Amino acid sequence: MSLSDKDKAAVKALWSKIAKSADVIGNDAVSRMIVVYPQTKTYFAHWPDLTPGSTNIKAHGKKVMGGIALAVSKIDDLKAGLSDLSEQHAFKLRVDPANFKILNHCIMVVISSMFPKDFTPEAHISLDKFLSAVALALAEKYR
């Protein structure tokens, strides 16, 4: 699935509005993922505290949203722009790529609840396509 110029512009416009809240979005999205999809806890078993908003959850949420920020900046070539992250998730972290879709959904739920006026139907579809493209780029090294 490729992103149209309209999709790219919509993602960049939405990101410009939400970027300053990225850490909160990341914390809430990772917290939501851990609670709603408890099978994802297996990747974080080494953390002493998996409760929503814990120090580890906040730190990981910040990393996740840093990756999203990187993806927005590399939106014209996500495969190359996210190559290092793909390699890390495939070979070091060994994350099942199906979990990218789960986290993407949680990110969209949080953004839609925090920014309801900005999360228009057009922004929704463009962000969904973008996050799907990010997940595909992150899964690249699994092949």
UniProtKB/Swiss-Prot annotation:
| Positions annotated to bind heme b | 89
Which residue positions does N-acetylserine occur at? 2
**Which InterPro entries is this protein grouped with?**
Globin (IPR000971), Globin-like_sf (IPR009050), Globin/Proto (IPR012292), Hemoglobin_a-typ (IPR002338), Hemoglobin_oxygen_transport (IPR050056), Hemoglobin_pi (IPR002339)
Domain Globin: start-end pairs: 2-143
For molecular function, the Gene Ontology terms on record are: haptoglobin binding; heme binding; iron ion binding; organic acid binding; oxygen binding; oxygen carrier activity; peroxidase activity
In this chain, O2 is annotated as bound at: 60
CDD domains reported for this sequence: Hb-alpha-like (cd08927)
Cellular component terms (Gene Ontology) = blood microparticle; haptoglobin-hemoglobin complex; hemoglobin complex
Q: Which domain of life is it from?
A: Eukaryota
Instruction: Cite the record's tissue specificity text.
Output: Red blood cells.
- Gene Ontology biological process: hydrogen peroxide catabolic process
Keyword terms of this UniProt record: Acetylation, Heme, Iron, Metal-binding, Oxygen transport, Transport
Report quaternary structure and partners.
Heterotetramer of two alpha chains and two beta chains.
Family the UniProt entry places it in: Belongs to the globin family.
Function as written in the Swiss-Prot or TrEMBL entry: Involved in oxygen transport from the lung to the various peripheral tissues.
Q: What is this protein called?
A: Hemoglobin subunit alpha
Q: Report the source organism.
A: Artedidraco orianae
